[in-house]
């Protein structure tokens, strides 16, 4: 990890406790699993996180159905899930997972017979190891209840700079609090703040020429809270590098 940017926290709008689902009741859904016993099949994914082990998410991850995925804006959000109302297959306790992928609909199958991720169903396709913490493998699919919870991360928000001159594609990972980045901005040491556009997943794009400048980042999550990481990347940064900034507390 590179230079740790100075953190400024700005509280905008509502607090984390009032994010959709925070502090509310449990919501009914269903869960299946994918990716194999080592979760190798969960790497990559529609959020753009790549290797989930090296990014710190591990096997506590989920692919979300259309109803939950929010066109990628739910990437990075955290859910507590427990198996419900199935004494044969459910195990006690709950899990907390991070949304890292999309479970696409299969309109060729009925919603109650294989089309688990079809709209309007709320469905979690869990990494197999974490599924087996709340249900037996042989169950295949189980009824669950879930709620949004704050994400707890170690270290700062991470910014991986990809692309090339005039096309800066920044992958934002390891976001605490609400976890789901809804807007981002970037500032070079010789520029003003510039809004970034979301390219896909949690890859955010700037078309400015920022080479040779220290980079600051502004990240806002769905609850309206913002973290500003000043000079997170030093002037000598290179494409492909990852730098750590501030963090939601």
Curated annotation (Swiss-Prot):
Please state what the protein is called.
Answer: Expansin-A10
Its subcellular locations are: Secreted, Cell wall; Membrane
Q: Which InterPro entries match?
A: Expan_Lol_pI (IPR007118), Expansin (IPR002963), Expansin/allergen_DPBB_dom (IPR007112), Expansin_CBD (IPR007117), Expansin_CBD_sf (IPR036749), RlpA-like_DPBB (IPR009009), RlpA-like_sf (IPR036908)
* Record-annotated membrane-spanning stretches: none
Gene behind this protein: EXPA10
Give the UniProt family note.
Answer: Belongs to the expansin family. Expansin A subfamily.
Domain Expansin-like EG45, residue spans = 44-156
Record keywords: Cell wall, Cell wall biogenesis/degradation, Membrane, Secreted, Signal
Q: Specify the protein's topology with respect to the membrane.
A: Peripheral membrane protein
| Domain Expansin-like CBD: from-to ranges | 166-245
Question: Which positions make up the signal peptide?
Answer: 1-21
Pfam families linked: DPBB_1 (PF03330), Expansin_C (PF01357)
Of the GO CC terms on this record, one is: extracellular region
| Primary role | Causes loosening and extension of plant cell walls by disrupting non-covalent bonding between cellulose microfibrils and matrix glucans. No enzymatic activity has been found. Plays a major role in control of leaf growth and influences the mechanical breakage behavior of the pedicel.
One biological process term from GO is:
plant-type cell wall loosening
- Which tissues is it found in, per the record? Most highly expressed in the young leaf petiole and midrib, in trichomes and at the base of the pedicel.
Q: What is its main location?
A: secreted
Q: Which organism is it from?
A: Arabidopsis thaliana (Mouse-ear cress)
């Amino acid at each position: 990890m590179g230079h740790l940017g100075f953190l400024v926290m700005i509280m905008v709008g509502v607090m984390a406790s009032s994010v959709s689902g925070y502090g509310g009741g449990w919501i009914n859904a269903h869960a299946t699993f994918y990716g194999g016993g080592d979760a190798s099949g969960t790497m990559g994914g529609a959020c753009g996180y790549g290797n989930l082990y090296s990014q710190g998410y591990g096997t506590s991850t989920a692919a979300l159905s259309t109803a939950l995925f929010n066109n990628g804006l739910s990437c990075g959000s955290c859910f507590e899930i427990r198996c419900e109302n199935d004494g044969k297959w459910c195990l006690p306790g709950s899990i907390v997972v991070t949304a890292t992928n999309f479970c696409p609909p299969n309109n060729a199958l009925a919603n109650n017979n294989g089309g688990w991720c079809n709209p309007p169903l709320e469905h979690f396709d869990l990494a197999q190891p974490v599924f087996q913490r709340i249900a037996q493998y042989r169950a295949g699919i189980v009824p669950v209840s879930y709620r949004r919870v704050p994400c707890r991360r170690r270290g700062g928000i991470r910014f991986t700079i990809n692309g090339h001159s005039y096309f800066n594609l920044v992958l934002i990972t390891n976001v605490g609090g609400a976890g789901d980045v809804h807007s981002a901005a970037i500032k070079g040491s010789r520029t003003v703040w510039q809004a970034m556009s979301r390219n896909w997943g949690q890859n955010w794009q700037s078309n400015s020429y920022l080479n040779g400048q220290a980079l600051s980042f502004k990240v806002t999550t769905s609850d309206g809270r913002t973290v500003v990481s000043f000079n997170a990347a030093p002037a000598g940064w290179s494409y492909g590098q990852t730098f750590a900034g501030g963090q939601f507390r």
